Each structure stands twice: as structure tokens, then as C-alpha cells.
């Protein structure tokens, strides 16, 4: 099932930490979480890359207001799309390669695998503190492919799991936790998204789903609970109207404060060291088992 390669791609040589963002089911706001993690880390002065491997539903270009941008080929490989003049945040997505936003992607597993391999091996990421990989929901061909490509990569920091409070979403998260254990990816923590609704008029937060399921699941599986994120209509409007300027205005929002706290928990020195130790243990276990 897994690749027998023992070295990571040279294109990842300048990447310090690789983080997967996973969800058990669609519609839980995983790409929104990935976007805000990237914006928050970039605001903290980190160099961040976002790789969108949701091949049949790439949404990262739209979240960043970069749908009209294109990647181009250099002598070293594909150059990602940079969101700012300081080049602190860059993006790669199949959405940049489609001729039209409405184009559908109807690919079988082998072609998906080839595309992900090309993203990992042929993109000129340069020096990055974090590469965030936005994945499709569930455990599909894309997940298996990325696991194969990163199986022996030393920069794997771990996975952030996104869920919503509903029971059906929490049940699917258990599958993601099992997937991470099987492939040896440490869990950085669980985020409960859509935990309440923020009124755009009075800013009061009301629960429209149940609450606390993500935190309870984290306790059950002995994972870190990174926090709750409400539904904020102001952020939705901001994404719709940003036109490529999201990075400049996001820092003044209430969501930015929430994600600053989440990043402090997920990417604290203590949590990162613990994740790296877990990754080493899992790789040793895999080698012992002959995987």
C-alpha cells in the first residue's frame, strides 16, 4: 500500500513543518479552517504554504480571492501563487490549473495519485515554516497518495482534525483518527467548527447545533482540544468581497483572535516537540513491522 521510498522530495527540502488538515465528512468548514490557520501563521511572521489536494472540489483559490491567478512553470518547477508582496504566504491548487472555475474534475485514482505526486515533487516551495495541506473529506485516494508521498518525510508535524458539534460529524472524525494512527501521523488537536452562530447585529453567539462534542472526543482519544470556532457571517462576507486582499484585513477580525489562540495551542513548542517524538516512534514502529 505504501511507497518504499525513504527520502522526501527535494522540493520540500526548505519546508520545516508539514501539517495536514483533515475532516471526516464534507461541509464542516475544513478549507475555511485551513485558510485561517494560514492567515494567522503568516500574521505571526511565519512563511506559510497551502497545498490544496481536494482535486474534485478545490476551494482554496476562492477563499483567498485568487481565482484569477495562475501558476507558471520555471526551470525548477511550478511556482506557487503568492498572496502578498512580502511573499510570506503562497498557494498551490488544481483550481489554478483549470481553464474555468466551472470545470469539473472527473478523475480515477491513478490520475489523482499522479497529480498529488506532481504537487509534492514539482512545486518550488522554497523556504517555509509551515506547509498546510488541505485535504478532501473522508479517507480517499488523495489521502492514500499523500500518505505514500510523505511516508518517510522528516518534516511531518501532524494533523489538525476539523469537526462540527453534530453526532454524525463526530462519528466520522473517529475514522480520521484511526487513519492517522495507521499511517503514523501525530494528532496536533481537534477543532470544533460551527460551534454557535455570531449575530452580525449584536455579536451575541447562539448555539444552533449541540456543543462540546469535539472537546469530549478529544478527551476520549487523549488528543489536544484546540478550541471552538463559531459561524461568523462577517467572515463569510469578507471572503466574498476580499478580491485578493484578505490577508490585509483579516487581522482586525474577531475570528483572527480565535485562531491566534488555536495556533498557540497547536503550534506551541511543547506540542510540536511531542508531535515530532510521536512521529519518530510511529516511523520506528512501521519500520519494525516492515511497512
UniProtKB/Swiss-Prot annotation:
Example GO biological process: iron-sulfur cluster assembly
Protein name: Cytosolic Fe-S cluster assembly factor CFD1
Subcellular location: Cytoplasm
UniProt-listed SUPFAM superfamilies: P-loop containing nucleoside triphosphate hydrolases
PANTHER family named in the record: CYTOSOLIC FE-S CLUSTER ASSEMBLY FACTOR NUBP2, NUCLEOTIDE-BINDING PROTEIN NBP35 YEAST -RELATED
Role according to the record: Component of the cytosolic iron-sulfur (Fe/S) protein assembly (CIA) machinery. Required for maturation of extramitochondrial Fe-S proteins. The NBP35-CFD1 heterotetramer forms a Fe-S scaffold complex, mediating the de novo assembly of an Fe-S cluster and its transfer to target apoproteins. Required for biogenesis and export of both ribosomal subunits, which may reflect a role in assembly of the Fe/S clusters in RLI1, a protein which performs rRNA processing and ribosome export.
UniProt KW keywords: 4Fe-4S, ATP-binding, Cytoplasm, Iron, Iron-sulfur, Metal-binding, Nucleotide-binding
